[in-house]
Amino acid sequence: MSTKPKLAVFKFASCDGCQLTLLDAEDELLDIAGALDIACFLEASSRVVPGPYDVALVEGSITTPHDAERIREVRRQSKYLVAIGACATAGGIQALRNWADSQEFLAAVYARPDYIETLATSTALADHVTVDFELRGCPINRGQLVEVIAALVAGRRPRTPNHGVCLDCKRRGTVCISVARGVPCLGPVTQSGCGAICPAYDRGCYGCHGPAPQANVASLAEHWVRSGAGPAQLVPLLRNFNGFTPEFRRVSDELAARLAATE
Amino acid sequence: MPDLLLQKGDLQLLFDRLSGDGFRLVGPTVSQEAIVYDEIASVGDLPRGWTDVQAPGSYRLEPRSDEAFFGYVVGPHSWKKYLFPPLATLLTADRTDSGWAMHAPPEPTEKYAFIGVRACELAAIKVQDRVFLEGAYVDPIYKARRDRCFIVAVNCTQAAATCFCTSMNTGPRCQAGFDLALTELSAAFIVEAGSDSGRQVCGQLPLREATPAERAAAEAARAQAVAGISKRLETEGIRDLLLTNLEHPRWADVAARCLSCANCTMVCPTCFCSSVGEVTDLKGDHVERQRQWDSCFNVDFSRMNGGVVRNDVRSRYRQWLTHKLASWIDQFGQSGCVGCGRCITWCPVAIDLTEEVAALREPGP
Ligand code: SF4
Ligand code: SF4
């Protein structure tokens, strides 16, 4: 019997992009396959070895009663559970439903809404089970995923920095697009992990890796409002892949209330 | 040596001379809607006809009405990115049958000529020299680059709204620490040599002695920069002011605005903090020890066994400002601030350290 750690990959409500990152780790894939027994990874192979597993990488958010049951089973079967991606760590873009009436959506989309069983919200795995490690991002970063796997194989803590995106812009010499062009950018309050890609391509940060620790989102939003950006622009910026995290949610709710008051 | 005159059309000859001596030219150039420092090939890469308009939290690149080569102030980059690189490999190690084989990275071979260094930046390089070269430990990465660089300074002939070098006694006139210093006039540069290598280069350029009228014109151009400075930092008793007001209510006030995003420390030409970590391959057979720019504004920067020491924005902003303006004096015998104004311009929420200090001078309510 193999003594290599048994790895399983599971998917909930998600786009598959984060699991694809594992397949995308082409340079490391052979080493990963050598170091781990990939016991369940449906995107790569139909071979499924039953649990328990040493490590589970779990993608996706919890959006149905069935999901809520299944994540508990995954937890029971897994020694070390890693939530991967914004869906699994924050509810994902589909958490936009949390501000709307999901029954209304069902009625608009499906001919027979009564066939569909869904929860009113899309929520993070940690809202349902204990999560051992959260790897953020929409999608996750390949280098960070390899780091997490390398750390698990070596039996050490993964090293995924939690500082803001600005540090990465500065290290790579990107000129701040917020200061030099007045573009609202979530970089100062967003956790690093992407390598600060968007500002290097003239776009403000979308907050893909979620709020940085102790993020002062309210001050950043106030500054934009003073500089002339209205809540109508700022609310959608904050309600994105990580919009339902408490830090982003609190401020987008405040701005939305202000917007409603002026309408 | 008397002041000399270099016709603008001959500026390229200076660049050719330096390239011919094996220097890689680094200087101002327009990129990403700003005037940045990057490798340049010829005078054609200089930001001729461009300027910067700066205010707290705001920088705009704008065209000038003339063709000045150096008609701007300081931008988002500083020379520290060449002397103290943002990412450096300190050592690599490979697992072998007989244990770990360690390798020091190769010595850098490139030598830089910095074109357009301002007085506050000369002062900032001096501050970092003190940190990296003059203490008990000499940083070999900084030293290798610093020993070999050639500095062409440029005297400012205008100031930004964020400049306060006059408060810090660092400018705007370049006094020392350069090989050559230029003052830009409309058709020529007045050239001063500040070192033997500078004088040697002068000897190989078609220069003539400046006339009294040309020297007066240079003096007048430099006076415009002094006249343009409106910002002031009162430094009288600043060390004691900061260190005896650690519980002043202003710290909580600034913490409510500060994002702890670290931009101020990254753009500051004197901030020198870094963190060192090991990066391994998946098998753990190859390890690189890397040093990266880091900042006292990052939560994990003060993480020690047992937890984070400065676990809120208030304590981190206070750490930065008191170090920069007060305990730096105890540590290095001078202020850590040269008055370049970068931290004011590049703060995404327009926090201005001179205003914070002024508020700390007022008794709390
Ligand atoms: S003072 Fe400004 S630039 Fe510095 S950490 Fe605070 S918000 Fe960021
Ligand atoms: S503290 Fe600010 S003004 Fe002073 S040297 Fe640093 S960036 Fe320039």
Feature map (PLM): residue ranges:
Chain B
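Iron-sulfur-associated redox domains of electron-transfer enzymes in respiratory
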Residues: 1-243, 249-251, 271, 282
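Residue-level detector of anion-binding/catalytic polar loops
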Residues: 24, 264, 343
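A generic structural-conservation signal
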Residues: 27, 267-268, 346
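Single, functionally critical "micro-switch" positions that shape active/binding sites
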Residues: 21, 261, 340
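Ferredoxin-type iron-sulfur electron-transfer modules in oxidoreductases and energy-metabolism complexes
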Residues: 235-256, 274-365
